[in-house]
Amino acid sequence: MVKLVSLLDSLYGYKMIHEGNPDIHSIHMDSREVVEGGLFFCIKGYTVDGHDYAQQAVSNGAVAVVSERPLELSVPVVVVRDSRRAMAQVATKFYGEPTNDLQLIGVTGTNGKTTITHLIEKIMQDQGKMTGLIGTMYTKIGHELKETKNTTPESLVLQRTFADMKKSGVTTAMMEVSSHALQSGRVRGCDFDVAVFSNLTPDHLDYHGTMERYKFAKGLLFAQLGNTYQGKVAVLNADDPASADFAEMTIAQVVTYGIENEADFQAENVRITSTGTTFELAAFEERMELSIHLIGKFSVYNVLAAAAAAYVSGVPLQEIKKSLEEVKGVAGRFETVKHDQPFTVIVDYAHTPDSLENVLKTVGELAKGDVRVVVGCGGDRDKTKRPVMAEIATTFANQAIFTSDNPRSEEPMDILRDMEQGAKGDSYLMIEDRKEAIFKAIELAKEDDIIVIAGKGHETYQQFRDRTIDFDDRIVAQQAIKERWT
């Protein structure tokens, strides 16, 4: 329980209507979840405006409301310029600034965030640390998994989660930090010790508008790093041009990694096979060979980023090497589906042009037969990448099958027609039903072919306008293989 005015001390400026200083027992952004003694934040969403539900929140027990405009209510109304940012600051104080007591590592970038955070988690667990993880796949406190709705949750959920981590004995936490979260201020109040940048390629332009704005949003993580007396570190990809801008934006120590350009963590003599990747790692004064189970040049970048983050967090390089060489993979990331079939099936989360191209190029270098790809694009998301995804699919695969991803409120065939605009040649099919598309790819496969099922990776659902169904690419692929080969 905290007094309202005490919580408001964390805000830079506000106006109070209906003065009062009630006890705050909980904080909410969903009026349906408000209980007696709650503080309700009016948040403007894409389709719903929380200001329209302020009275309902009061009826449910809210004793104060934070809004972006004056409201006629019977409880104190705190008017702020940006209620979402205010919520981040208030939530941080309400939950006792939990990240101040955690070693917090944030990872941002277009691709690779999930893999990098999981690699760091493995290294830290091997050091005997109790870890927490927040990202695309789930929230994890120790070994307990919880479902997440966003890559980076809303600040209210985020700070509550960090408080739960602290209470559970977590000492080190890894978090995927999305550009949406940075732009909207969700991670305000998070005290990052290390911030990692993976790469920057076109994505989310429906939200940010331009690549320059997208880059600026990513850079906010590094701009806010190093604002305290404690030593902070920015881990940047020396092979990505955006890193130069991020280095200028931060006052923290900068450590780099890369393959092509000179870096503090440098991979040399990279050798990729169908079972893994080996390379020589040169890091400061040390040099060693790593042999990892992960496949592809993009995997080397992920490993370098994780190694650098762990190293600046105090883990010796030899122990980092040992942990990384034990990693078998991350769910839905270049994950193979096996059932004694004479061809290879790979499920990958690749849902951006860059990630799809990386996966298909890697597969193309390994394939003895044809490369076939099943791919779609999400509905209600950046439409500009649809023809680009199709162009990449038809350029780097022998055959592409365009199908539904998560259509959401859009008509699936409208999305496929948008994709078709970028297709090269005629070596592609359009099959609206994703299960049917996967079965077709398996049916067409010949010995030594490689099939890539792209876009959904670890996801276990498919979202349509009026329903969400159970759907797992790995399970469907397994069913298709069994039907053909048993």
From Swiss-Prot:
Motif Meso-diaminopimelate recognition motif: positions: 405-408
Residues the record lists as binding meso-2,6-diaminopimelate: R381, D405, N406, P407, R408, G455, E459
InterPro entries the UniProt entry points to: Folylpolyglutamate_synth_CS, Mur-like_cat_sf, Mur_ligase_C, Mur_ligase_C_dom_sf, Mur_ligase_cen, Mur_ligase_N, MurE/MurF_N, UDP-N-AcMur-Glu-dNH2Pim_ligase
Pathway: Cell wall biogenesis; peptidoglycan biosynthesis
Major enzyme class: ligase
Keyword vocabulary terms for this entry: ATP-binding, Cell cycle, Cell division, Cell shape, Cell wall biogenesis/degradation, Cytoplasm, Ligase, Magnesium, Nucleotide-binding, Peptidoglycan synthesis
UniProt name for this protein: UDP-N-acetylmuramoyl-L-alanyl-D-glutamate--2,6-diaminopimelate ligase
Classification of source organism: Bacteria, Bacillati, Bacillota, Bacilli, Bacillales
